[in-house]
């Protein structure tokens, strides 16, 4: 099978994004390959095919960007190569406009990953919140232009069918929760906040759902991080604990406890 190289997303316009890719030198007949360009709002999918089949073409222009692009949304791309005679397929790396880090940044990311996976991190899952696509057929009101049921089991209160993209597992350092009692003249309630530090992937943004190794559900309320030459090295996010009984408690997380390591080995 062929191997991809130099995948990149480039654009200096608000009207489109250009996706380029190359193939490493090979003795195979490239005329027997079909390329399909896929786009997603989350690194783990689901993926939408936006171009293909392409034969001996290594560039496309995504002109649907103006309808779905905002400052708070990152679009990810990958290329699927299908060998028509054999039916075998392979995929490129997932890329966005930020691009791939240089060697120094990759080494910093590698050391951070070892730190989180072997010493200070715990297993977490990130559900990226949907922000475009099919509106919820059950709770979205076309006349009012908004969702009318915050406890809808179809969109999980987001207004978009499905609510969240596929979850991504990662290792992150989760701080002890900060507890605050909010007291008013009518009632009072306890609010818990925390902070999580993680590597550059998966990309975390406000309103995403994070589930920790204790099955606590957190809402991302603020994001920041560290970058080198435009490439993200570390992400830091402030979290708010979702109250018990909320609709987010019913979102299923399908894992096998026997095969998942939740915390690093304790020496």
Q: What does each model-identified segment do?
A:
Residues 23-49:
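Solvent-exposed loop/turn segments flanking beta-strands in beta-repeat/beta-sandwich domains
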Residues 183-184, 226-243:
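Short, solvent-exposed secondary-structure boundary/capping segments
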């Amino acid at each position: 099978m062929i191997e991809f190289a130099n995948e990149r997303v480039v654009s200096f316009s608000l009207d489109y994004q250009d996706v380029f890719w190359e193939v490493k030198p090979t003795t195979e007949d490239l005329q027997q390959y079909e390329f399909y360009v896929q786009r997603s709002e989350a690194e783990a999918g689901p993926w939408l095919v936006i171009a293909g089949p392409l034969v001996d073409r290594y560039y496309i222009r995504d002109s649907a960007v103006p309808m779905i692009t905002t400052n708070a949304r990152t679009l990810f791309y990958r290329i699927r190569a299908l060998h028509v005679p054999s039916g075998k397929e392979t995929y490129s790396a997932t890329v966005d406009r930020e691009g791939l880090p240089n060697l120094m940044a990759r080494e910093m990311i590698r050391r951070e990953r070892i730190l989180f996976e072997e010493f200070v991190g715990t297993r977490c899952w990130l559900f990226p919140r949907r922000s475009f696509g099919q509106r919820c057929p059950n709770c979205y009101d076309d006349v009012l232009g908004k969702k009318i049921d915050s406890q809808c089991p179809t969109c999980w209160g987001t207004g978009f069918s499905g609510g969240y993209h596929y979850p991504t597992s990662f290792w992150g350092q989760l701080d002890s929760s900060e507890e605050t009692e909010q007291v008013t003249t009518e009632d009072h309630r306890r609010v818990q906040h925390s902070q999580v530090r993680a590597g550059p992937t998966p990309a975390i943004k406000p309103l995403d759902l994070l589930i920790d190794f204790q099955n606590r559900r957190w809402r991302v309320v603020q994001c920041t991080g560290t970058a080198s030459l435009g490439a993200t090295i570390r992400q830091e996010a402030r979290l708010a604990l979702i109250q018990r009984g909320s609709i987010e408690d019913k979102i299923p997380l399908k894992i096998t406890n026997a095969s998942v390591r939740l915390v690093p080995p304790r020496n």
